[in-house]
Regions:
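Glycine-rich, mobile lid/loop segments that gate access to catalytic sites or pores
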Residues: 110-180
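Active-site nucleophile/metal-coordination loop of metallo-enzymes that catalyze phosphate/sulfate
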Residues: 2, 12-134
Length: 180
């Protein structure tokens, strides 16, 4: 038997005051989804020990134990763009972003975590330029889609304290720069 798994990733959203403090999903006309409400229950897909996110939840829904195999979103994204990783490789998401132009890089503000929804073609040119300037036997930059790219670190360090750019929109980036 074949199955189709449909994940409504991010569908819950946040309450919107203009919609009477309801979500877009609350006010949308969706008779088929509403019909499932009486048939389905709730499931915890993300273990309490892990931060909720689509990466962790998708692993669990597909039958993997995130507590045993989850090391971050980046290895999943690396594989999704065709990167063959070695056991000793560490994948790090490499986003193109838009920052303010303050002279001190630590005082710059994250204006846009998606570089203005940069096109994949423009982004490829930038990541290839970064690879030419910074890539070597240890660090390799790979173009992905739009603002989302990948850095593979050969024999890299794990357990880094990294903050996703979308978590710090409109904030000064200094305290969120990589640590360890």
């Amino acid at each position: 038997m074949k199955y189709i798994v449909i994940l409504g990733d991010g569908m819950a959203d946040k309450d919107i005051p203009e919609l009477g403090n309801k979500t877009i999903l609350d006010v949308a006309k969706k008779p088929h989804i509403d019909g499932l409400k009486g048939v389905l229950g709730m499931a915890r897909t993300v273990p309490k020990e892990l931060k909720p996110g689509s990466d962790v939840a998708n692993l669990a829904v597909m039958g993997y134990d995130p507590l045993k195999c989850y090391t971050g979103r980046s290895p999943l994204e690396a594989v999704s763009i065709g990167i063959n990783m070695k056991e000793t490789d560490v994948a790090i998401r490499c986003n193109l972003v838009t920052l303010s132009d303050d002279e001190d890089p630590k005082k710059r503000t994250m204006f846009d975590y998606s570089a203005g929804e940069i096109s994949s073609e423009e982004a490829r040119e930038l990541i290839e330029a970064v690879e030419r300037e910074l890539g070597d036997d240890e660090f390799k930059f790979y173009p992905g889609i739009s603002y989302r790219h990948c850095l593979i670190w050969d024999n890299g360090k794990t357990g880094l304290d990294l903050t996703p750019p979308h978590d710090i929109s409109d904030r000064v980036i200094g305290e969120y720069l990589p640590k360890n």
